[in-house]
Amino acid sequence: MNRVLYPGTFDPITKGHGDLVERASRLFDHVIIAVAASPKKNPLFPLEQRVELAREVTKHLPNVEVVGFSTLLAHFAKEQNANVFLRGLRAVSDFEYEFQLANMNRQLAPDVESLFLTPSERYSFISSTLVREIAALGGDISKFVHPAVADALTLRFKK
């Protein structure tokens, strides 16, 4: 069985992330969205909420599960019996970092391959950072995130 691990902070999960998950769900038997705790990034949403939002966005996909983690990615991949890391590349600027990460992961988990997918053109400009900035300034984010995510962002910035 091919099990792909799609790691990220997902703060928040966007339609771009959702697009990659949908496409991966057609390519792999099982897709694991691995939501990283990432405390050094100082996420807007706590891990539990990011996991719940990702579950809401992907609940229509029966072969997708969402799991939070706070360990080394290579170790987590082994725990999950994953044989592929999935990473999205929006632009050439993403490639250098992702290339270094893939090589490091290969050293730490040689049995797990890295696969890069580019997003659909309509999502290639979306990033969680931009979505957070637009939401913080009261802008319309409905084109970029699932309604549940938009609601969570609206509530978060009303405080």
Curated annotation (Swiss-Prot):
It is found in: Cytoplasm. Pathway: Cofactor biosynthesis; coenzyme A biosynthesis; CoA from (R)-pantothenate: step 4/5. The keyword Nucleotide-binding applies. Reversibly transfers an adenylyl group from ATP to 4'-phosphopantetheine, yielding dephospho-CoA (dPCoA) and pyrophosphate. It comes from the Bacteria. This is Phosphopantetheine adenylyltransferase. CDD domains: PPAT (cd02163). Belongs to the bacterial CoaD family. Its cofactor is Mg(2+). Homohexamer. One of its GO terms (molecular function) is ATP binding. The keyword Transferase applies.
